[in-house]
Structure formats: C-alpha cells, structure tokens
Swiss-Prot record:
Ca(2+) binds at residues 12, 141-142. NCBIfam families: PRK00407.1. Transmembrane segments: none annotated. In solution, exists as a monomer, trimer and hexamer. Oligomeric states form a tripartite complex with tRNA and PAB1947 methyltransferase. Keywords: Calcium, Metal-binding, tRNA processing. This is Protein archease. GO terms for biological process: tRNA splicing, via endonucleolytic cleavage and ligation. It comes from Pyrococcus abyssi (strain GE5 / Orsay).
Length: 142
C-alpha cells in the first residue's frame, strides 16, 4: 500500500513516499510533490502523460523523474494526482517508465499552495525499511 506525507525541514517542506515496492514509493513521493503545489484530492484524472527517464543510480532516477514531472507542470500547466511507475535495472543503471494522471491547473478548484522551483538532492533518501516496505524522500526547492 502506498502512502505519502510531508515532514518538517527548517523553512522548507520535505516530501516522503512509502510503498510495498520501490515503484509504489516513487509514485507516492510524486503525489506528495504535487500536494505541495495544490490539493491533490481535488485533482481529477482527466489527462495522462507518459514519462521515460534514466538514472545511473536510484537517487538520480528519482531526481530525473520528479524533475520531468515538474517540467510538464511548468510547460503544460498540468497537475497530477496518481502515477503508474515501472522501474527496470539496465547496464547503465536504471530506467523508469511512468504514466502520470491529472488535469490542467484550475486555481479555483485545486487551491494552489506553494511553487516548487526545482527538485534537489537535499535530504534525499531511498531505502528499504526493516518491515520490507520502501521509502523515498527529499526536500524540493520552494
């Protein structure tokens, strides 16, 4: 079961996602990212975007995934509420393919909160927890 949360980090907002699999943790942290931007519970799954990124390690894969979502948000004005992520190991590291579900930003409907300027490696952790679940976290630049 995937879930996400925000956590206190000085003047910033940390985002953290949990999942039964690595993919679910990536999905959950992406939801947490968009919940920093808007109220994701008010976003409907009207449009889908496909994302493909690579990374030499899991940290760069997560960074590239979230950065690509932020680029789509900035260019197309879309906000997302759900994701389907597939990760595979490659000779050069990892490859991620995802579907992102959401709709055009409507300030009246989605209740904009913060502007995320960039994804960062600040406080980034990706780990398998003792209970077998996965956790992914970082602090984006607000």
């Amino acid at each position: 079961m995937k879930r996400w949360e925000h956590y206190e980090h000085t003047a910033d907002i940390g985002i953290r996602g949990y999942g039964d699999s690595l993919e679910e943790a990536f999905e959950a942290v992406a939801i947490a990212l968009f919940d920093v931007i808007v109220n994701v519970n008010k976003v409907e799954k009207k449009e889908v975007r496909e994302v493909e990124v690579e990374g030499e390690d899991l940290e760069s894969l997560l960074y590239n995934f979230l950065e690509e979502l932020l680029v789509i948000h900035d260019i197309e004005g879309l906000v997302f509420r759900d994701f389907e992520v597939k990760i595979e190991k490659t000779e050069k590291g990892y490859k991620l393919k995802a579907k992102a579900y959401g709709e055009k930003l409507d300030p009246e409907k989605h209740e904009p909160k913060e502007e995320v300027k960039a994804i960062t490696y600040h406080d980034m952790k990706i780990e398998k927890l003792p209970d077998g679940r996965w956790m992914a976290q970082l602090v984006p630049d607000i």
